[in-house]
């Protein structure tokens, strides 16, 4: 252990999803959210699954595709200032294990939600729109692209 030394990463945002235990913690947080929503009285199971999916995808969209920059003062001369967390992750390399995990997780949650809502039309449409809103920005073709200038600065 090196006491008193700084981390070796220029931008710690690039490797945060590769930290030990982060994937398990992420899945457990989704499970905890679901259990908390299940504990609300008079809310049906299909509504809870849809709420779990919508809250997860909203949080994922905000934290990965809307928030830009880094909370650290980095010596990269402002390169990370204009990039979302998704674009910074793994130094922008596509198809890494972390990116695959964060792409597959909402898909698995979508399948579970669709199953437990018994493919109800309203739930299905809400969950599909929510899934597309987090999957489309993850496409490699949209790396660094700001559609209609949204989130440009």
From Swiss-Prot:
Question: Hydroxyproline occurs at which residues?
Answer: 137
Q: Which UniProt key words apply to this protein?
A: Endoplasmic reticulum, Hydroxylation, Membrane, Transmembrane, Transmembrane helix, Ubl conjugation
Q: Could you tell me the membrane topology recorded for this protein?
A: Multi-pass membrane protein
Pfam families, alphabetized: ORMDL
Coiled coil (residue ranges): none
Cytoplasmic compartment residues? 1-21, 64-94, 143-153
Q: How is it modified after translation?
A: When hydroxylated at Pro-137, ubiquitinated via 'Lys-48'-linkage, leading to proteasomal degradation. In endothelial cells, ORMDL3 proteasomal degradation is controlled by the sphingosine 1-phosphate receptor signaling pathway.
Subcellular location(s): the record lists: Endoplasmic reticulum membrane
| Transmembrane spans | 22-42, 43-63, 95-117, 122-142
Family membership: Belongs to the ORM family.
Q: What does this protein do?
A: Plays an essential role in the homeostatic regulation of sphingolipid de novo biosynthesis by modulating the activity of the serine palmitoyltransferase (SPT) in response to ceramide levels. When complexed to SPT, the binding of ceramides to its N-terminus stabilizes a conformation that block SPT substrate entry, hence preventing SPT catalytic activity. Through this mechanism, maintains ceramide levels at sufficient concentrations for the production of complex sphingolipids, but which prevents the accumulation of ceramides to levels that trigger apoptosis.
Protein name in UniProt: ORM1-like protein 3
Species this chain originates from: Rattus norvegicus (Rat)
């Amino acid at each position: 252990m090196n006491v008193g030394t700084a981390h070796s990463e220029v931008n710690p945002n690039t490797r945060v999803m590769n930290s030990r235990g982060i994937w398990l913690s992420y899945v457990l947080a989704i499970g905890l959210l679901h259990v908390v929503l299940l504990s609300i009285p008079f809310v049906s199971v299909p509504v809870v699954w849809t709420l779990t999916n919508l809250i997860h995808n909203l949080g994922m969209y905000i934290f990965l595709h809307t928030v830009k920059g880094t909370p650290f003062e980095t010596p990269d001369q402002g390169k990370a200032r204009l990039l979302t967390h998704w674009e910074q992750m793994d130094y922008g390399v596509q198809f890494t294990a972390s990116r695959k995990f964060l792409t597959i997780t909402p898909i698995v949650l979508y399948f579970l939600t669709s199953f437990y809502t018994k493919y109800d039309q309203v739930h299905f449409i809400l969950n599909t729109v929510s899934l597309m809103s987090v999957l489309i920005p993850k496409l490699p073709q949209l790396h660094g692209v700001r559609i209609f200038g949204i989130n440009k600065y």
